[in-house]
Amino acid sequence: MARTCLVPGMKIVVILPTYNERENIQSLLDALHRITKNIRGYEFSFLVVDDSSPDGTEKLVETYKDKYPRVYLLSGKKEGLGKALLRGMEYAVEMLKADIIAQMDADLSHDPEVLPQFIRQIKKGADFVIGSRYIPGGSIPDNWGLHRKIFSVIGNSIVRFGLGFTSVHDWTGGYRVYQKKYYEKLHMQMGKYRGYV
């Protein structure tokens, strides 16, 4: 497979799925703006995909858009993370003309300070970069209960060894950066599936 390297001027859209993230979204957007302004030559946009949060997340993002013009809001009914990510990917590619898509959780469990490292790997020729909880330097959130931790470890092990992709340590993590071509391939294969992506 041919590798595609980042070219200056490419558009990078960071997708932030939200549900009741009013307490976190402003801090996250502030951090992302601060961090990405130091990555020269690329146009960053931030797409908040809100699932009708009853806590006012959507209203807060609307006011934030006045402060930063590259913040976009895509609202929809609550249909789960998978559907929100698919809506976000489609909007990022079709409307915002993304060349590169990044996705991260809006609850601050994914460190925005790591995003430049992901971008550097894409720039070096990687097609897909995944942030892993299961490698040195990674961690599982403190607020996860024992059952969730066990389910995550077992689920990832089944996928890693069942599919033979042992070099990827965290298949269920949501911190990713990838080339647009992966969305296009996924979009063709997914059809009407609306589960986790």
Regions found by a protein language model. Give the residues of each.
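Short, well-formed alpha-helical segments that are part of the catalytic scaffolds
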Residues: 21-37
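Conserved donor nucleotide-binding strand/loop of the catalytic core
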Residues: 47, 58-91, 95
